[in-house]
Structures are given as C-alpha cells and as structure tokens.
Amino acid sequence: MSATSTRNKHSKIHGNEKVDITKDEFARMRLALQDEEFRKLFFDYVDEIQDPENRKIYEQEITQLEKERGVDVTFIHPKPGFVVKTAIDGELKCFINICGSQIVERPNNEVAINSETGERGLTWSIPMAQAPARDDIDANKKLCKVFDVVFHPDALHLGTRNSQFRKCLIDTALDGVEREFNVNLDRANLKYPKLDYKGEPHATVIRKLSKNATAEEREPHPLEHTYPKKPEANAGKPKVLPMKKNVTSTPTFAVPKYSIKHSHDIDMAQYTDELDAKLQVTIPRALIVEIELPLLSSTADCQLDVTEKSVYLLSERSGAKYRLKLDLPYTVDDKSGNARFDTEHRRLCITLPVVRSSAREQRQMHDNVRILSREDSGVELNSNSESPAEDEEAGSEAIVELTTMQQTQTDNFDAFPPRQSFLKRDLHYQMVANFDCNIVENVMAFLLHVPNVQPDSMRTVIREGRSVHLQFASMGSGYYPTNYAFLVQLPDAADPQLHIDHVEPDASDDNVVLRLFMSESCMTLPSYLAGPDATDLTEYACFPPCKTNIEDENCDLELDKPLRISTYHNELNKSIEVTIIPQDISEQVHQEQQQEEEEEEEQHEQQQHQHKKGNKKQRKRNKKQRSLSESAFEDLKAEQQQQHQKQQQQQEKLPENSSPESLNAGSSEPVATLKLPQRKQRSFSECNDSSSVQRGILKRFSRYGPRPSISESSSSIDDCSSSYSCSVDAAGIGFSHSFGGIPEERVIADAELSESCKKTVRFNDHIMKKMFRLDSSILGQRKKNQKRRDCKLRAQQRRVSEGDSVDYEEVEHASNGQQTANKTAANAQYFKQPQNNNNRSYSKNNKNQSLHDSGLDLTNNNNHNNEEDTKRNEADAKNAMIFEMDDDDDEDM
C-alpha cells in the first residue's frame, strides 16, 4: 500500500488521474493472483501485448476504428537520441528523452536581419512532437518522471555537429515540457547521463479530423462517450510559438525551497494573571529553517553562513548548484545555532535560538506596564508640601531642570548627528575587532585588520573637524558581505586648534589603512576615542607607557666620579637591565659578589660530599672484599708494632741535617713507608695503615675490548709502587712501565700531597662494540658468556695459586718485619684453598731452592732484606691486577 500511495501522491501532484481502489477490489486481486491458472493467463496477456506483431495489428485496428469516426490517427515511433536529467520543482527527479522520427517535419531557416543591431543571421523553425508524461523508476528504485520530445533526425544530426544548435534543441524541449505540463524545471542543474533513451519506447499518437470524411462518418456514434473526444477542426495545424524577444539567461544557481518555523516552549508562567506574563509570548524561542536539497547527498560541498539577521547557503557542486539568501524575522544567536542534514529526505534543518531582550529591558518594560495600568483614584498621596505655594515653587524648579536637560540633550544631538544620517537603518554594522594606531608628525594612521574589503563600499565623513566616521563592507568566505563602522573622535582634552583637515582611506586584501591628516603636529595627543558610533566610544592611549625598572627615581648620580655601567639581557622577558654605579662602589660590590659565590660553591661541595652515596659498582666491590679472621689480625698487629719500632730506630740513626731528598736517595726502604695521609686501595689489605696509595681514575677496564696501556691511564700499581722499577704481564697482554723514573716528593707527617700525586687521564679513540647473533636469543648468549667468563676466571686463579704459592709462603714465614708483611698475610688469608695447602707443603720442602721466576728484574747490590721486599711488592702488584680482573668480570655479569 505504501508504494501505491506514493505513486498516487505523485500522480495527483502532476495532474494525472488518481488510482482509486477499494479494499474489496484489492482483496479480489490478491486472491486471483494466488491462483496459478490466473497467473498463467495474466503472463500470456502481457507477452501478447509486448509482441511487436501484435502491436502492429493493434495500431491497424485503432487506425481503422478512428477512421470510421472521421479521425485520422498517426503513430510516431521515437528513435533514441540523448537524455537530459533535471528535477521538477526541485523535488522530483525528471528525465527528458530527445528522440527522432521521420514523421516530424524537418527544421528550416530563413535569413533575417536584427532590427536593433542591424546584424544579419538565420531564423530557425524547429518542429517537434511531445508525448504525455509517464512514471518510471531510477537506478535507486525511486519514482521519477519521463517525458519524450521528438524532433526530425536531421535536427539531431545538426545538434551533434554544432554545440549552439544542440543547446537550442535542449532549450526548445525544456520550454515545451514546462508549457504543456505546467511544471518548473531546474535549468541550473542539468545533467547528461550516458543513455540513449530512458525506459521502454512508447509510440506517440497524432490525431486530427479527416479532410474527406463522408456524411456517415461525421454522424455521432452511439458509443461516442466511450471513445476519446474528437479533435477540433484546427487541431491538425501545428502550433507556432514566436521567438522570445527578451531571452532570459540561464541561471547559474537554483533557489531551493525553504520554510521558516517558529518554535515555542510551554512556560506555565505565561498562563498566570501577571501583567508581564505574556510579554514574550509572541517571540519564539528558536527559528527552524528547513531547506530542501534533493540533488545533494551530503553537505560536504555546501557553504553555510549565519548572521544575526540572515542565512546564506551556497553549493557549487556540478549538477547541484544552489544559492539561497534568506532574511530572518528575528535577531538570532549565530554562535549557539546548529545544523543537521537529513540524508533520507535530502533536507537541511537549521535551528537558531532567538535573542530575547535582556533582564534590564524586561524590568524596564515591566515597570512601564505597571505604571500605565495604574488607576488614578483622584487622591494625592505622599505629599510633603505644607502649602500650595511650596508646591508651585517645587513645580517651577522641576520645570527649569527639565528644560535644562532637554536643552543639553538637544545640544548633544546637534554636536553629533544621529546614526541614521550616515549609516543605513536596514543594515547591521559591526565594530572592528582589532586595529592599530600610529602617529607621525601631523598624520594619524589607523590599521584596521579586516580582510577582503570592497573598495567601492568605503564611505567617510568628517564632523566639525573633530571626528571621522568610516563604513565599509567585507566579503566573507560564503560571498556574504559583512558591514563595519569605525568612528574616531578627538578627546575634549586635546588642543582646540587641532582639527582634521582631510582623510585618505585605502583598502587592500588583508587590511584597511585610514590616514587622518591634522592641522598641526599631533605627537602630544594623549589619547583618542574609537567605536562603531557616537553612542559607543572607548578611550585608547596613543602611546603605551614604557616599562622601567628604576626603583628610586630621586637618586642623584655624581658625575665627577667615574661610573661603572653594566647591562643584562633577559631573553625570557625580552628586556634589558642597565645598572649605573660609581667605580669604587662597583669594585666593592664585585668583591662581595665574588666572596658570596665562593661561599656558595664551598657549601655546595660540602652538601654534595655529605649526600654522596656509593653507586652500585662500589657496593659490588664491597661485597667482594673479605674480612680477615681474628687470629690473623692479631698476628698482623704484632708484626706491625715490630715494624714501627724498627722504623723509629732507623730514623734515630739518621743525621739530623739530612733532607727529604737525601732520605729518598740513600734509604733502601721504599718511599711508600714514609708517613703520608692514609688512603686506602682495594687491591691491598685494609689492615696496612702505613700504605699511601691512590686508585687510578680509569682503573676498571672492559672485558671485551683491548686493555689500555698504563701510559694512558694511571692504575693502582703506580700509586703504590712509584719508586720501584718493574715489568708486569697482565692477562696475557704484555705491557711495561717504569715506576721509578718519575721523581715524587714525599713530605713527612701532616704535609699535603704534591702535584705529582695528581692523575692525568688520556682517553683512547677505540670504540667498544657488542655484537649479537640474529639466530639466537640475548638471554642464551648471556648465559654462555657468563659460563665462559667463570671458566677463565677459575683457570687464572688456579694458575696464580699454583705459581705464586711459594712466594706467599716465603713472605709469610719471613722474619725481617718489613712494611708489607701485613699485606702478604692478608693475601695468604684470602687465597687459602686446598690447592694452596699443597703448594705450601711443596714450598717448605724446597726452601733452599730458587724462587719462582715472575719475570721481574731483581738483580741489584742491596742486602737480602731489600730483595725479599722487592719480591713481596711484585706479588702484591700481581694480586692487585687479579682483583681488578675479578671486578671487571663481575660488572660484565
């Protein structure tokens, strides 16, 4: 039923007969179609009608029947040409088939001269035939209308060769459809689909009276009412339509259909008996503007501009060009509105809230209504006067005051003419939101930041030489103009002789420049007034105040004394600070600043030293250290006391006038035995209080890169053995360094370290890299590398324990009591393992044999004690290197 209703609705709109069917008829048709035999007969009937041979027989019978009535019938079979697509009344889609037939007469032309211009040309006469409109469906299965317009094939051929003649054919077809069927076609949105013919071709019938009809044929037929009405006598003559004299240009844009609805809210306050209950009843809450856009599927190509009093719509899409400019009956809030496009009905709905009067205006209106509705009782109330004379005096004073106020208002209106004298009443003017003012000599220039200003719309007026009023229009993005007004007025405090001579406005694409030429220099002008009109002016300063940082403006500088000028650039605030003080004061201030900076640096260093905590590597080193047992510590303490006594005896034997240089040169004891500030080294035992060593800055080496030479970075060995001359082989990489070639000064107790104790660091250019295989996981490689490092570490410890155990046993049982006995005991305690026990037994059985060859050159003329000291120092150096390797492996793990 919905499809039938839709078809009937459109048929009724466009003049066709409405199909009226009852429920009984519809039920019978439904039952009949359920019968298989009826459906078979119905399909046979359809095939018979569509058969071309049967159509010819049908046309012959119709021709014979009409001839018996004295009517000649001619069937026109249209041949496809091309199709024009448009819309009817902007709502229903429409197709016009431009066809050809030999029955239609050929187009002819005549030579004619234009009476107005005198030009010579051709006047064409183009015959055509039209068929009644029929319903069809488009590609989206929606209802549409189809019209057939038939021309001679020669006319179609000329249209294919000449574009102007083709346009003439299209205009002729559109005019014929609009005239015959009383419809409005959308000529601004014509489309030409790739079709030769829309729908199934239908034959068109031309009916006219027979010229040689007999008397019998002219007699009325008994069944005349069942046949079509006979044509009139002049029906056979073709209609000749004169050419349009005033040819209307084809519109570029179509005007869509629209409607404005007033939306109200139900407010219960309007149903009370208050006087102001219905003051806003006639003003709607919002305006709803509905615009029909049947040729648009979305509003992506639409431009919509909404102002307080108008709505402007523009669509430049090919085949769907719309333009609408609509004035609104009420002032609306364009910032709070919303728009929604209904894709099903192709309708744009715009909701705009109406701006109502403010609370102040409503209150004033309420008071006025209350005053007007007050009834006069004839009795005067609240009279404070005691006699009629006082009333007369009060009345006279009131009259004088009122007259004065009226005179003042009249003067003001005379000084400033009303706004309507220059600005138009029907336009809404806006104030320029952003502008700048510059003053140079007698020129006052205003830069108004308004783009796309039309130069033709600029108008200026000078009022009494004290103010200038400017109005102009700017074209927005939707080609909708916006009007602006700008009034500049000189303040009352300005010089009375200063006035405006003339004005030069200049408009560009980005802004407007307004130059005011004064009668004299206006550099001293403090301010000016600006606004849209004389009733709404705001005061602006010509020169903004400068920012100064002068704290004391009353300070006097003595010019006789030399001055110190300093500047400070502040990039953050974009400012410059200039300080001017006398020279003597500046020196004192400079010294005080230096002292304060030094104190701050010392405090900062102390805080860092106090809050400094050991990192993760230091904690790992501390975990690796092992403490000695109590028994070993007691033995070391006893040996240390014996050593201290021997040192005191040796110092007493030395001559009193001996210098530190002679001690260093003649003494067989190493320099490290002298008293220096005690500093601890991880590679030696912490029980040795007399050791004075310093740890190298770049001691910890990487396991995966080449170890740097001792010449590049100082290590712990040169700190402890600076007076020895030795050669060390570490981790299979041979490198040597002379520890005795660098003379170092050693100061006895309570002396500071000399410059020779400072470390010099040199960095190598070698870059350490870590490679990973692509076909294995990182965790798997890490476990393998860790196992490999553990095996290497155990092998190195095993070799050292087997090769150096003899040296440790000799040092442990030595009775000379030298300085490094405690270190040897600590190392022996640290490396106590089953293999070491076997080495000790082996070393006891071979005491008289030569010691293990460690690669050190020990041949000298010193006594036996010095040789033993040298051996112990070599063993300590090797142990230190082993500890360093151990630490490096732990870090890698």
From Swiss-Prot:
Residues 594-603, 884-893 have a biased composition (Acidic residues). Coiled coil: none annotated. Keywords: Cytoplasm, Phosphoprotein. It comes from the Eukaryota. Residues 214-232, 865-877 have a biased composition (Basic and acidic residues). The keyword Iron-sulfur does not apply. It holds the Pfam family PIH1. Residues 609-626, 781-797 have a biased composition (Basic residues). GO terms for molecular function: protein phosphatase 1 binding. Residues 211-243, 372-395, 587-719, 781-821, 834-893 are annotated as: Disordered. The keyword Phosphoprotein applies. Residues 656-667, 684-694 have a biased composition (Polar residues). GO terms for cellular component: cytoplasm. Its main location: cytoplasm. The modification Phosphoserine is found at residues 377, 801. GO terms for biological process: axonemal dynein complex assembly; cilium-dependent cell motility. Required for cytoplasmic pre-assembly of axonemal dyneins, thereby playing a central role in motility in cilia and flagella. Involved in pre-assembly of dynein arm complexes in the cytoplasm before intraflagellar transport loads them for the ciliary compartment. Interacts with Pp1alpha-96A, Pp1-87B, Pp1-13C and flw. Belongs to the PIH1 family. Kintoun subfamily. This is Protein kintoun.
